[in-house]
Structure formats: structure tokens, C-alpha cells
Regions:
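Short, acidic, metal-binding catalytic loop of nucleotide-sugar glycosyltransferases
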Residues: 8-26
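Short, flexible/disordered intra-domain loops and linkers
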Residues: 1-10, 58-65, 157-165
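Short beta-strand-to-loop acidic/aromatic patch adjacent to the donor-nucleotide binding site
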Residues: 81-94
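C-terminal catalytic/acceptor-binding lobe
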Residues: 157-250
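Conserved catalytic core of nucleotide-sugar-dependent glycosyltransferases
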Residues: 96-165
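Active-site-proximal specificity loops/subdomain of glycosyltransferases
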Residues: 35-83
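Short, high-confidence coil segments that cap the C-terminus of an alpha-helix
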Residues: 83, 108-110, 181
């Protein structure tokens, strides 16, 4: 499924450490995977749920389907442990350490979409501030009251696909609003979206498209130059809040 299992494990371990760096202990992490990643970090608040799903193909649609099926498995386990809210986290992103405490302080809310946060370029180790709509760019983007996801838990695997399904992050907030259970904007920056590590599905898809088109390659180079003017280094406070540290891809 991945081009580099070693890199996947390194990225996942950073995400796991970030997710478990909460200021509140009132949380559980459910890792849904085909194969358990090889990491040196462990805690009793992490549960590994290995699933026997068909391996996805190399295309984007197949990978998205695989991700949504894993999310469904995670939902069912979250229900079994009586979770109040759930948040789906991609295996390479980093999240704010204040999320669990904030949710615990607002137990009756439908949930939140993470519209604000950062993009992070691994190769350059730079951040770009995102002031809006970050929840449309990454799957690490919503905290949802578990009861609102009952329809998704009851879907047959063949029905798990983009459409009237909350599990596709681009549609999540809009569908919940249509159902009469809207989410609120999270009132602080909640996620660092890792964009260019090579294991990111959206980024990889765009990179392939650029390499297959000369004009797109030029535009990508211009975009890269522009990025240097709109990015910032990682500060100590951001590093501490999000558990972000450099990854050696070798």
C-alpha cells in the first residue's frame, strides 16, 4: 500500500505521540490498520484494531474507499467503549494538545470542524497558516458526537462511498448541516496538515499529475517559489502544542 513502510512508521509514530500529548487524560486512541506499524511509543490509551479488508489499489478512489472502511471499523469500536465524540486522524498529521480537554468541557455539542490550522512542508520544515477551510483539505478535520454517526455505522461496506456519507471529509460538515446537526468552527487552530511527505494521498496524486504535464510542472515550480514568501518556521510553542518534530525520510 505504501512506497516506504519505514517512512510510514516514522510518520505514524509522530502522529501517535502528537495525539497522545493531550492536556486531558480523557481520551482513547483507536488505530485501525492492516498491519500494525513498528513504533517505539506505546501507552494504555492506544488500541490497535487490525482489519482484514481487501488491500486498496494505487488509485485515489480505491485508497479513499479503504480509508472510509477503516473509519467505519473505528466508529464501531468507539461505540463499544462508550465514546462521546470521535475524531478521525490521518496517520501523518499532528493535532493540538488541547482537543481532548476542550471536548470534555463541551460534552453536549454536536462537534466541530477544524477550519483553521497549518500546512507543513516536510522537505522545507516550514508552516503555512490556514485561516479557513482547512477541513476541506485533510481528513484530520472534524470532531463529531458519536450518536450523529449511527447512519454510517449501519452502512454495508458496498454503501461506504462518497455521497450521503459523513466519512468523506470534504462532505462531512455539509451533510451534518443538512441533517439538522451542524458542526461549529473549532475556536482555535487544531491541526497541522502534513502535505509533502510522499505518503499523503492528495499530495501524491497532485505530484503525479504535475510530472505528467510540462505546464503543470512549471506552475508547480512557481507555486513552490510563492510558498517561500507565505510560510514561517516552526516555533517552540507550536512544536510543543502539536508534537511536531522533523522526520528523516531515509
Amino acid at each position: 500500500v505504501s512506497g516506504s513502510w519505514n517512512l510510514v512508521c516514522k510518520l505514524f509514530e509522530r502522529t501517535l505521540r502528537s495525539t497522545c500529548n493531550q492536556t486531558s487524560s480523557d481520551y482513547q486512541v483507536i488505530v485501525v490498520c492492516h498491519e500494525k506499524p513498528q513504533v517505539s511509543f506505546d501507552t494504555s490509551q492506544v488500541t490497535y484494531l487490525q482489519v482484514n479488508l481487501p488491500l486498496p489499489g494505487a488509485d485515489y478512489a480505491s485508497k479513499e474507499k479503504d480509508k472510509m472502511l477503516k473509519m467505519q471499523h473505528g466508529l464501531l469500536h468507539a461505540k463499544a467503549i462508550n465514546a462521546s465524540h470521535v475524531m478521525f486522524v490521518d496517520a501523518d498529521d499532528c493535532v493540538s494538545q488541547h482537543l481532548a480537554q476542550f471536548v470534555a468541557q463541551n460534552p453536549n455539542e454536536n462537534g466541530w470542524f477544524l477550519g483553521r490550522g497549518f500546512d507543513y512542508q516536510e522537505n522545507f520544515r516550514l508552516l503555512r497558516v490556514r485561516h479557513r477551510n482547512l477541513h476541506l483539505r485533510t481528513n484530520t478535520s472534524h470532531v463529531i458526537k458519536l450518536d450523529l454517526l449511527e447512519p454510517e455505522m449501519k452502512l454495508h461496506p458496498d454503501e461506504v462511498k462518497r455521497g450521503d456519507c459523513v466519512l468523506y471529509h470534504i462532505d462531512t460538515a455539509a451533510i451534518l448541516k443538512q441533517r439538522g446537526t451542524p458542526l461549529k468552527l473549532l475556536p482555535f487552530r487544531g491541526v497541522i496538515y502534513i502535505t509533502d511527505n510522499g505518503e499523503n494521498m492528495w499530495w501524491s496524486q497532485q505530484n503525479i499529475a504535475s510530472k505528467n504535464n510540462g505546464i503543470q510542472s512549471i506552475l508547480a515550480a512557481l507555486k513552490s517559489s510563492y510558498q517561500s514568501f507565505i510560510t514561517q518556521p516552526v516555533t517552540d510553542s507550536i512544536r510543543d502544542e502539536f508534537g511536531l518534530y522533523p522526520i528523516d525520510a531515509s
